[in-house]
């Protein structure tokens, strides 16, 4: 074993040892020349005969071994081998096993088995699995499925045998899949196919196929016989390429199933008719007995690494030896360490077979060359060029580079390997002499910056110094960077990388908090101000957040010192902005605004410049008198003083300061400034200025004409005094349940307190935290009186009393129905008083009330009122057609609930009639029936209302009548509005949005007739109060639509203009810029002819829009055409090698030239007949200037191109490769098989010519006990 990795769940994450080294496979090429082929005797000299030691091949069982029964272990261990050619993950990345490692960890976690992996010399993978039997079997199945390449095969057995393969509840199939590590797919019962598909490894497929055929044979109605034949003699029975057993099956018609070499079974199963089966068994027995007598064995030692050459591709070499010599060659399993190969056959043929075995084993040799792993890439060369030269001369040599190992493995014919080894050793020596490497430590967090965007930095260093730089991936968190190449280049690259890293270590990132409102100002118009900052600090990167993020963080990144300087500079700029953002409002009488502005804005301009402020005046048509000044506080104050002084000079304006306590300012201003505005208007439009809230100042300034100022002052002081006296406050406390009682029904009680005392009583709102607090505000004496009254009421409420009253039992139900709704309302309204009615079933009329004395009395009074209402209750009928009932009720019955509350009545709607459609024809009378018999009198009267239309109202008579009127007012009415039919779809709007909006806005229903009726009448149904508004709204919408129709007709004017198609691209412009400008400027639609349409005139441009606009657009297009017709085109020869430089990155350079000279320059496309021809189009004088300019550029750039090409000749001389001749492979003369060379080539797809038989032999079983 070359390397072993133990995988456990604890250590697996740290396992990065390169368990499966990356193989660098090099395809061999045919040699150009070949010498005469050697003779067979020269290539394979005969070996001296030597007696075989048979004793070593057999191991005697201990005498005591059979007496002791083996103990069955609960934990078992199994070893599986995955050959190189069947490994799924051969090429692993340089940082570990990658996917294979993940898969193994997953298998261990899922199955609970323990895995150990090792790599054999032949690069095969050995996996040892330990654990309980079921865990090992599951792990094995997963390993095969996920780490080994999968093949598939089909086996045909009778359809009726499929169920026996599946077994009860699928158990047999599952067991078979676990045992063979395969996936077996059996067709469904309704599928006529009898093919069973097996997927897995080659060995697993053989085992599964054998087991399926055995199950089928057992169920076969024909005779089945099993014959025990030693495993070693199976190859003789099968014959070379299975021909012998195939002949027997064909001749006898018997199916013979020989276990594959990988299955450790000795019995051969025969299925067929009895007589024919007996013949087949007899023939097989005869062959077996004959071979058992005549054959003998010899054991030879052959290196394990050479076994695969003896086996050959798909066991082909073994079959060849068996065919030519009649000798069976038994190779130990690949997972065995044994190197012993057993030859079994007739004594006289063993010598020849032995010669062939050694010839095949020694036909190839394996050697290695010591070479540091970092030099491997240079030996291989760019795209394998260096190695290709070697493999062209030695095509049979396989060269293998293993990642992480300081050696190169060579495998192939001995002479070729020696020559190749010498060549590679010379290359290694030369590279060691002239190449160097260095490893440097740079913090991994800087690695991605060293690499640069898309590898720009690192690729530049590689190209500049001709070195290879290996940076570990981020996942490794490694700081080690390796530089390889020319010693001088390595040192230069090292110096530059360390300088970059040092610069990055010195770099820092700083977040600066700047209010987002200043970001646009700092950036400036078109980025001018930020460009100045970046020019001042070129090494600092400044990043502003996206405006959508609403972030205040501005990020600075760069060298520490520069970042600090830039931070201070920007902070100073922000401080200036903050200072300059102070704003004050100055009210100035409207008639003086023009004097403040001055002639041509002279006055205001002077104030702005001298005070360094921004002054905004209201628009002329605005009613506002306020002038806003923005800038530094001191400057704003100075500008305000100057503006006020202008106003003072112009008119008799007085200014008075009044001292009013700051706490009264808000109450004087009033809600949204209404109170102070009324004083200002009443006193001739004076200006009253209060100090900023929170400043603590008591000074209020009044400005205006002297007489008005005095009047305003008096009013303001009087109001302040009044507010002062009325702002006395007292807080009292009462339980929240008392509040409703204190307020009284409809606020009656609290209104009495307010009226008698003049004080305001404020109860807490639902969202207030302190629900006990009641606040009284007003004059002191009024507040004290109200406090006294309320405290007396609260004290009475705190005195709980119990009282009773008599209520007729017939009324009890009214109080307790709907879960005592009436009683709950009484309790809420009267301070939580408890009312207890006697139990149902008892005839008692005593009702008990418990609570505060006042509450109890009020509750008794309320109950008495309810009883009186019940006794005075009448029932009224209100006839409203049933179709209007839903509309009358309103959403969720809200309208009816409102009427019930307002009039204290009960309203009951009739049940809905199942079939509301009634025939207008008279009912047909049967013989013997009299008119009206069996019907109610009202039903027989056609004028009487239907039962389903009658709504019952219960309550006091006067309230019932009022409720009836209210109900009738809710009956919807319909009006018809005439709207032209062609406007209906616009009234409805997209997906009904228009009509839905009107219905919601006016609370009506609008019915538009169906399109097929072609009717102009739209019906509006709703409450009479809403109909007028809805009708007016609909007619207004019709007017709007008619105006839009007229506008559409005017906009649809079309105009055609004839323009030569060659000018169309110029009129359209780059990305449609020119034509878009014309469209937007003239508000028109411009349509160019479709190039693919042959029927359409190609010179007609159609313009659609208002007539005046289309004519203006036409004139604009014709002006462009006029300019284009004056233009000329000239071809100029320009060396194609400089085209790219003249065009520039993304065409920037050529666009600059075209804009500068106002010309169009067209370069030839790839594949053009003349690659140097460039066309310049424009006005004659512009074309000449542009041509002169680009010819000067050509001369300048061409000098650089010539120098560069001359340098390339020396740096990269041309490589001349000779023609490669096809390889003939390895050829010898006078070989034993030359006689059969005339036979046709073997068929690779034939299982007979390329079987898997004979590749391995079953391991010998040893008795339990100590090894001897």
Curated annotation (Swiss-Prot):
Biased composition (Basic and acidic residues): 932-947
Region (Disordered): 910-947, 1237-1268
Phosphothreonine PTM positions: 8, 295-296
Gene: HDLBP
UniProt GO MF annotations: mRNA binding
Disulfide bonds: none
Primary localization class, coarse: cytoplasm
GO CC terms of this entry: cytoplasm; high-density lipoprotein particle; nucleus
Record protein name field: Vigilin
